[in-house]
Amino acid sequence: MTFDLSPGAWLAPVVDWLNTNFHGLFAAISAVIEAVLGGLQAALLFPPAYAVVLIAAALAWALLGWRAAILAAVALCFCYLLALWDESMETIALVSVSVAISVAVAVPIGILAARRPRLEAALRPVLDVMQTVPPWVYLIPAVMIFSLGRVPAIIATIVYGIPPMLRLTTLAFKQVRRDLIELGHAIGAAPRTILFKIEVPSAIPTLVVGLNQCILLSLAMVVLAGLVGAGGLGAEVTRGLTRMEMGLGLRAGLAIVAVAILLDRMSRAVLQRGHVQAARS
């Protein structure tokens, strides 16, 4: 006697039921994501390439100094010289939207979990499973619900990027010194003031690590999502793989490295700048 456990036997009816009863909700989610993603991509592609390079370099100079400005300019010029400018901008837009939503979901839950041990205990096995599941698996339900295109890629990337950000947010707020919080209560500070003036600045170093992990995992997922029609550099990697064109795959891979370095440095700079300003105030 053999046992055949097939998740598809019950998963397919569930997906059909969701598509039938929540089609309007999924269509609205798709429309919102497409609008935000399309607007950001259009904003990146509207000015000439040299203008984007100058803006990124100026922003990096203001946040981190001249070394970061040179790094940002070199990374973007490298993408342009590889003849992958449009694809690089599309990938930056995909990752930016995905990371922004992942952070918006993970940070509040992480703060709440740091204050509620039972919630943290309940979330721990869920996060363990989410971080153990191969990234390809996230694309399957997303494609089944949202069909092919950029939207399922964004949804899968958001889900894939939430666990590291949530874990490190919880850790960051648990590591805040209790005497600082007690001092805030002693001087009569409101809970909101304690959160934004004491806890958040103290948690910034660990939050930077979480954001870095979220960006890198999101970038990896966006590249894999080229298989489902997400576009960007992931589509070029997929094209190089299917056609056995090593040059195309290598060019796209190098552009991905440049984009990853750019996003990592800029995100770190923004958070660290906020940390310094909060400490001064």
Please provide the spans of the model-predicted regions.
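Transmembrane alpha-helices
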Residues: 155, 159, 191-225, 247, ...
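Transmembrane alpha-helical segments of polytopic membrane transport and secretion proteins
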Residues: 1-5, 12, 27, 265-281
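Membrane-spanning helices that line or support transport/gating and their immediate boundary helices
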Residues: 87-91, 111, 121-125, 168-175, ...
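Interfacial loop/helix-cap signal at membrane boundaries in integral membrane proteins
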Residues: 1-48
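Generic hydrophobic transmembrane alpha-helix motif, especially the helices
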Residues: 94-97, 102-107, 111-114, 124-161
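Glycine-rich helix-loop "coupling/hinge" segments at transmembrane-helix boundaries
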Residues: 144, 218-259, 271-281
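Transmembrane-helix boundary motif in ABC transporter permease subunits
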Residues: 56-63, 75-86, 99-127
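Short cytoplasmic-facing helical segments at TM-TM junctions of multi-pass membrane proteins
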Residues: 164-213, 237
